[in-house]
């Protein structure tokens, strides 16, 4: 496969979800209009917020939408409600699947493979769970996936809990899974820092998609 150029952004600050979502939409629209434009990868952290997919059930929010303490966004992805917050590493991939494989099931399995390789790099033993999307450690979920796709241009991506306040997941039914327990990477390898994990995320995505990265 010929290497494809991708723009990568890895901000050090904690980012507002809505600002980054608008950025994703801009890059997606640019690729739809002209597929010679580069793909786009964003790796970072968000301020506390909750996001719902296109068909999400609002019953999985265990607080009122009128409660101004919580920022809630309905976005272009599949899946149910999830939570983003500092200490959780989020990766967005705006890719033209026509250059890889026009198969969303293939793409989801690819992301799961990437997550397992990332965690394995830090000697964290994880696995898939039959009937569910995402990655698990023992009986706890450590990584969630939510994607959208328009004209084979993807949006959104995956999150890995690094060292976040897992209590924030108690405000929802995570991914619509009753009694879903969540896990942090740091609980399984104390000698980690999030900057090192970000480097490995970048490296593995570059290898799996044969990207030439350009920082912007």
UniProtKB/Swiss-Prot annotation:
Its main location: cytoplasm. GO terms for biological process: protein modification process. Pathway: Protein modification; protein lipoylation via endogenous pathway; protein N(6)-(lipoyl)lysine from octanoyl-[acyl-carrier-protein]: step 1/2. Keywords: Acyltransferase, Cytoplasm, Transferase. The record marks 141 as: Lowers pKa of active site Cys. It is found in: Cytoplasm. Substrate binds at residues 77-84, 144-146, 157-159. InterPro entries: aa-tRNA-synth_II/BPL/LPL, BPL_LPL_catalytic, Octanoyltransferase, Octanoyltransferase_CS. Residues 35-213 form the BPL/LPL catalytic domain. It is an enzyme of class 2 (transferase). It holds the Pfam family LplA-B_cat. The active site is at 175 (acyl-thioester intermediate). Its EC number is 2.3.1.181. The keyword Nuclease does not apply. It catalyses: octanoyl-[ACP] + L-lysyl-[protein] = N(6)-octanoyl-L-lysyl-[protein] + holo-[ACP] + H(+). One of its GO terms (cellular component) is cytoplasm. Catalyzes the transfer of endogenously produced octanoic acid from octanoyl-acyl-carrier-protein onto the lipoyl domains of lipoate-dependent enzymes. Lipoyl-ACP can also act as a substrate although octanoyl-ACP is likely to be the physiological substrate. Belongs to the LipB family. In the reaction, the free carboxyl group of octanoic acid is attached via an amide linkage to the epsilon-amino group of a specific lysine residue of lipoyl domains of lipoate-dependent enzymes. This is Octanoyltransferase. The gene is lipB.
